[in-house]
A protein has these predicted regions:
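Conserved NAD(P)H cofactor-binding loop of Rossmann-fold oxidoreductase domains
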Residues: 73-78, 218
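Substrate-binding pocket helix/loop in short-chain dehydrogenase/reductase
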Residues: 80-93, 178
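Canonical Rossmann dinucleotide-binding motif of NAD(H)/NADP(H)-dependent dehydrogenases/reductases
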Residues: 2-31
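Active-site helix of classical SDR
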Residues: 104, 138, 146
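C-terminal helical subdomain
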Residues: 161, 176-208, 215-217
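Alpha-helical segment proximal to the catalytic Tyr-Lys
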Residues: 109, 151-155, 206
Length: 234
């Protein structure tokens, strides 16, 4: 077991990608602590709240005295320039950028040598659909925060980010064009992201830090122009 007796913190770990990541670490022997707004058997709280983050960090450190791996996964609000208010935009940045920064700061002196931070960003950190400004800004900030933290916290802590594309967290099966538009002819699965998170936080990735890995089935590399190769813009 690669992570036996390691202490792993996962934000937004109640469902979806976060839940999958948490379960994968548990399956390899780790102690996993989750913080999420959703009611359940974990620390319940909104990571946009500074006081909640401080309370959560005290809880984790009192219980374990250290954190080996921090996974910043919690999902920011997605609203666009037409409807997103000033307060909502700032809230998205608190969840998506400020909370990952502050948790890294709170745990900074309690990371053992060889620790790892994994930031779950998004392929939207480099490409966009209309009306997604709050989310896109948060993910872009998180990707940039990754390389900044890697320099500040090294060599004790490695910091990397993952930018998922379309990851299906539902029970719906997607086929046809939804799948075949991807170069691998399928939509992503939470395990695709969890596998990379575990690799990046393992000793096998000991020479990787400050990096961003895109996992999107090739979508961000597909050049699309109206009228070429059957694509059309409507």
């Amino acid at each position: 077991m690669r992570f036996k007796d390691k202490v792993v913190v996962v934000t937004g770990g109640a469902k979806g990608i976060g839940a999958c990541i948490a379960e994968r670490y548990r399956s390899e022997g780790a102690y996993v602590e989750i913080i999420d707004k959703t009611p359940g058997n974990w620390f319940i709280g909104d990571i946009a709240d500074k006081d909640v983050l401080e309370e959560f960090s005290k809880y984790v450190l009192k219980k374990y005295g250290k954190v080996d791996i921090l996974v910043n996964n919690a999902l920011p609000l997605m609203k666009g320039i037409d409807d997103c208010t000033w307060e909502e935009f700032l809230y998205a940045q608190r969840v998506g950028v400020a909370a990952p920064f502050y948790l890294a700061k709170l745990f900074k002196d309690y990371f053992p040598k060889g620790s790892s931070i994994i930031n779950i960003s998004s392929s939207r950190d480099r490409m966009s659909e209309p009306q997604t400004e709050s989310y896109t800004a948060a993910k872009g900030g998180l990707t940039a925060l990754t390389h900044a933290l890697a320099i500040s916290l090294g060599p004790k802590v490695r910091v990397n980010s993952i930018s998922p594309g379309w990851i299906n967290t539902t029970e719906i099966e997607y086929d046809g064009p939804d799948a075949t538009q991807h170069s691998v002819a399928r939509v992503g699965r939470p395990d695709d992201i969890a596998s990379m998170a575990l690799f990046l936080s393992s000793d096998e990735a000991g020479f990787i830090t400050g990096e961003n890995i895109v996992i999107d089935g090739g979508m961000t590399h597909r050049m699309i122009y109206h009228g070429d190769h059957g694509w059309s813009f409507r």
